[in-house]
């Protein structure tokens, strides 16, 4: 990917993320025209029409208010991910946004699909990838199985960000914290994982600078150490 990547802990399409999303839109080169934004509710594809429709509507309203031309695409399963009617819209996008839901489902739906390949062509030309929650998790090396509290059942993810796991909602208490603790104990010495608090984003590019934006913090964890970074801080991702 050549465009920016935004790993978002929560808050997609809400006013709390306006500053982050304005930054992402300003980073693209739209040649003086309104940037094209594609909103993908793929991670909610198993939740029914009401949920999918909500994400499509919220994405359209949010980015229209920020001055973009918005294309909410109902790519919700493998058939729609391979539908050629969406290819050109994805290829011409300046920003592609994956909202939250089921990380395993969105990865398995998009992997090797025409939609994913078209999105990659857009990113290679400078488009932004923004992923919230599940949309952020699929860029790490692996996605854990939350149903088993992180004990087995992991699947490979796209591995675009060199973190073993990208964990959104990091400041959220409860069973989620148990999963994080299990995964951390299983890291190898050379591995790290990223935790992204709610209403917070980590924005950057692989091999370049990554900066915290938003309300709270980003956390870099190894098996033996943990470091937290506030908004404006640079996170030293290898």
Place the predicted regions along the sequence by residue.
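Portal/gating segments that form or line small-molecule/metal binding sites
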Residues: 44-100, 105
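General beta-strand structural signal in soluble alpha/beta enzymes
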Residues: 7, 71-72, 97-98, 129-132, ...
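Residue-level preference for short coil/turn positions at secondary-structure junctions
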Residues: 1, 33, 91-92, 125
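C-terminal and late-domain segments of enzyme folds
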Residues: 1-33, 43-57, 61-64, 143-145, ...
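A residue-level signal for conserved active-site and pocket-lining positions in enzyme catalytic cores
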Residues: 37, 96, 133, 166, ...
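Class I SAM-dependent methyltransferase SAM-binding "motif I" and its flanking Rossmann-like core
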Residues: 99, 105-175
């Amino acid at each position: 990917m050549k465009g920016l990547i935004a790993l978002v802990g929560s808050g997609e399409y809400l006013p709390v993320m306006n500053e982050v999303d304005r930054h992402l839109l300003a980073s693209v080169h739209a040649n003086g025209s309104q940037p094209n934004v594609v909103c993908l509710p793929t991670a909610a594809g198993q939740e029914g029409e009401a949920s999918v429709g909500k994400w499509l509507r919220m994405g359209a309203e949010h980015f229209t208010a920020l001055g973009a031309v918005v294309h909410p695409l109902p790519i919700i399963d493998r058939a729609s991910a391979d539908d050629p009617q969406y290819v050109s819209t994805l290829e011409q996008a300046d920003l592609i946004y994956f909202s939250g839901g089921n990380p395993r489902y969105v990865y398995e739906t998009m992997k090797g699909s025409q939609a994913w390949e078209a999105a990659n062509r857009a990113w290679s030309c400078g488009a932004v990838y923004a992923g919230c929650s599940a949309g952020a998790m699929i860029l790490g090396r692996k996605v854990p199985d939350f149903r088993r509290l992180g004990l087995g059942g992991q699947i490979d993810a796209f591995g675009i960000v060199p973190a073993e796991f990208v964990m959104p909602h990091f400041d959220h208490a409860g069973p989620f914290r148990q999963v994080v603790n299990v995964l951390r104990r299983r890291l190898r010495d050379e591995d790290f994982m990223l935790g992204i608090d709610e209403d917070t984003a980590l924005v950057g590019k692989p091999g370049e600078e990554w900066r915290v934006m938003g309300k709270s913090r980003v956390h870099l964890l190894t098996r033996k150490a943990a470091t937290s970074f506030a908004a404006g801080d640079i996170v030293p991702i290898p």
